[in-house]
């Protein structure tokens, strides 16, 4: 018989830097999860992606055990990294803060393809380009 699911917890955590302090501690503590066990497992799984923000979906079972799935970094983080920027524009329609090439957009779309709601690379590239435009970054 399958374990009964108690909760699904979604977090965005720096790769390799999970620790029991907020926001991780309170989010997992209220469900009775062993926080240090999660932190060690997460840090081991994401050690090769140092410096990236990694979304994680944690499934907590009724016996207080857990499993988790790591996803690809958010498109906005990948776009900022490609454009070598710290943050996007405060007014994206008027103020453009950087540029990325179509090749960079395609690379990001290829990386994000598993998490995007797109049937092909062209659709995925359009999604990534739209995200870049909404951040005040031009696609050239």
From Swiss-Prot:
GO biological process: translation
Record's keyword terms, sorted: Methylation, Ribonucleoprotein, Ribosomal protein, RNA-binding, rRNA-binding
InterPro entries linked: Ribosomal_uL11, Ribosomal_uL11_bac-typ, Ribosomal_uL11_C, Ribosomal_uL11_C_sf, Ribosomal_uL11_N, Ribosomal_uL11_N_sf
Entry GO CC: cytosolic large ribosomal subunit
Keyword Ribosomal protein: yes
Pfam families in the cross-refs: Ribosomal_L11 (PF00298), Ribosomal_L11_N (PF03946)
GO MF terms held by the record: large ribosomal subunit rRNA binding; structural constituent of ribosome
Highest taxon of the lineage: Bacteria
Modification after translation, per record: One or more lysine residues are methylated.
Classification via PANTHER family: 60S RIBOSOMAL PROTEIN L12 (PTHR11661), LARGE RIBOSOMAL SUBUNIT PROTEIN UL11M (PTHR11661:SF1)
Subunit structure: Part of the ribosomal stalk of the 50S ribosomal subunit. Interacts with L10 and the large rRNA to form the base of the stalk. L10 forms an elongated spine to which L12 dimers bind in a sequential fashion forming a multimeric L10(L12)X complex.
Family: Belongs to the universal ribosomal protein uL11 family.
Functional description taken from the UniProt entry: Forms part of the ribosomal stalk which helps the ribosome interact with GTP-bound translation factors.
Protein name (database record): Large ribosomal subunit protein uL11
Organism of origin: Desulfatibacillum aliphaticivorans
């Amino acid at each position: 018989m399958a374990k009964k699911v108690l909760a699904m917890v979604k977090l965005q955590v720096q790769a390799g830097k999970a620790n029991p302090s907020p926001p991780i501690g309170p989010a997992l503590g209220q469900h009775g999860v062993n926080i240090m066990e999660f932190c060690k497992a997460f840090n081991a799984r994401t050690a090769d992606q140092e410096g990236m923000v990694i979304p994680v979906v944690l499934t907590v079972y009724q016996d207080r055990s857990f499993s988790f799935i790591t996803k690809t970094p958010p498109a906005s983080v990948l776009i900022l990294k490609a454009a070598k920027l710290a943050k996007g524009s405060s007014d994206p329609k008027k103020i453009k803060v950087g540029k990325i090439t179509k090749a960079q957009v395609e690379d990001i779309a290829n990386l994000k393809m598993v998490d995007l709601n797109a049937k092909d690379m062209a659709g995925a590239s359009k999604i990534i380009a739209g995200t870049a435009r909404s951040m005040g970054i031009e696609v050239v």
